[in-house]
């Protein structure tokens, strides 16, 4: 699976982005609110990605922030929520607002999102609560305490959370091995070694 891409922006035609990597143009669907965060055409960008392969097509979805990708993956596992609706949800409210709406059973907030009716909102609350028991607070924490950490440390913590560790466990593991200039892969590998 393609998990991350770095390339030059060739075209922006919301909701699609054309990214050139080694002479190949990748068409990537991204949340509408991510377009304002992208650099100009001709500039380089990095996207976290999720690839869906179907019988008749291959779809690539991109996200500027890794927690958005994690939330997207959780959303598309819910019955009745496809990739397009998941993108609309991510574009309609911030990750923090969405997780708060789930945590506090705010059905009325969710029904304001395009394509989300009352039944879908209720299903989101029920199913997402179970999926996010260990990660909702973790994702909140990453959004609020990220300022004090290097980008690679935040990415490593997010990756460890997606592997099933709590935010507290992941933070401790990364802090034990964090050194200036280390890349994300090194931090993750070294952090996982601390558990052996």
From Swiss-Prot:
GO molecular function, one term: ATP binding
Pfam families in the cross-refs: HHH_5, RuvA_C, RuvA_N
Superkingdom field: Bacteria
Region feature Flexible linker, mapped onto this chain: 144-154
SMART domains assigned to the protein according to its UniProt record, in alphabetical order: HhH1 (SM00278)
Region annotation Domain II: where it falls in the sequence: 65-143
Stretches for region Domain I: 1-64
Compartment annotation: Cytoplasm
GO CC terms in record: cytoplasm; Holliday junction helicase complex; Holliday junction resolvase complex
Segments for region (Domain III): 154-196
InterPro entries with a match to the protein in the record: DNA_helicase_Holl-junc_RuvA_I (IPR013849), Hlx-hairpin-Hlx_DNA-bd_motif (IPR003583), NA-bd_OB-fold (IPR012340), RuvA (IPR000085), RuvA_2-like (IPR010994), RuvA_C (IPR011114), RuvA_C_sf (IPR036267)
Keywords: Cytoplasm, DNA damage, DNA recombination, DNA repair, DNA-binding
Record comment regarding domains: Has three domains with a flexible linker between the domains II and III and assumes an 'L' shape. Domain III is highly mobile and contacts RuvB.
Summary of subunit composition and partner proteins: Homotetramer. Forms an RuvA(8)-RuvB(12)-Holliday junction (HJ) complex. HJ DNA is sandwiched between 2 RuvA tetramers; dsDNA enters through RuvA and exits via RuvB. An RuvB hexamer assembles on each DNA strand where it exits the tetramer. Each RuvB hexamer is contacted by two RuvA subunits (via domain III) on 2 adjacent RuvB subunits; this complex drives branch migration. In the full resolvosome a probable DNA-RuvA(4)-RuvB(12)-RuvC(2) complex forms which resolves the HJ.
Function text: The RuvA-RuvB-RuvC complex processes Holliday junction (HJ) DNA during genetic recombination and DNA repair, while the RuvA-RuvB complex plays an important role in the rescue of blocked DNA replication forks via replication fork reversal (RFR). RuvA specifically binds to HJ cruciform DNA, conferring on it an open structure. The RuvB hexamer acts as an ATP-dependent pump, pulling dsDNA into and through the RuvAB complex. HJ branch migration allows RuvC to scan DNA until it finds its consensus sequence, where it cleaves and resolves the cruciform DNA.
NCBIfam families, alphabetized: ruvA
Name of the protein this chain belongs to: Holliday junction branch migration complex subunit RuvA
Organism (species): Baumannia cicadellinicola subsp. Homalodisca coagulata
Lineage, opening ranks: Bacteria, Pseudomonadati, Pseudomonadota, Gammaproteobacteria, Candidatus Palibaumannia
Gene: ruvA
């Amino acid at each position: 699976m393609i998990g991350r891409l770095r390339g030059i922006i060739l075209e922006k035609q919301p909701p699609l982005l054309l990214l050139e990597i080694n002479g190949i143009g990748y068409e990537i669907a991204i949340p509408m609110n991510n377009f304002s965060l992208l650099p100009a055409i001709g500039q380089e960008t990095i996207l976290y990605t999720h690839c869906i392969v179907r019988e008749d097509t291959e779809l690539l979805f991109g996200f500027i922030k890794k927690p958005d990708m994690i939330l997207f993956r959780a959303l598309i596992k819910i019955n009745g929520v496809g990739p397009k609706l998941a993108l609309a949800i991510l574009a309609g409210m911030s990750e923090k607002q969405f997780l708060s709406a789930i945590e506090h059973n705010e059905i009325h907030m969710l029904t304001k999102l395009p394509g989300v009716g009352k039944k879908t909102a209720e299903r989101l609350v029920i199913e997402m609560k179970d999926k996010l028991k260990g990660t909702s607070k973790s994702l909140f924490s990453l959004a609020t305490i990220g300022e004090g950490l290097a980008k690679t440390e935040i990415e490593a913590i997010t990756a460890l959370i997606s592997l099933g560790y709590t935010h507290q466990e992941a933070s401790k593991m990364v802090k034990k091995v964090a050194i200036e200039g280390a890349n994300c892969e090194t931090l993750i590998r070294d952090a996982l070694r601390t558990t052996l």
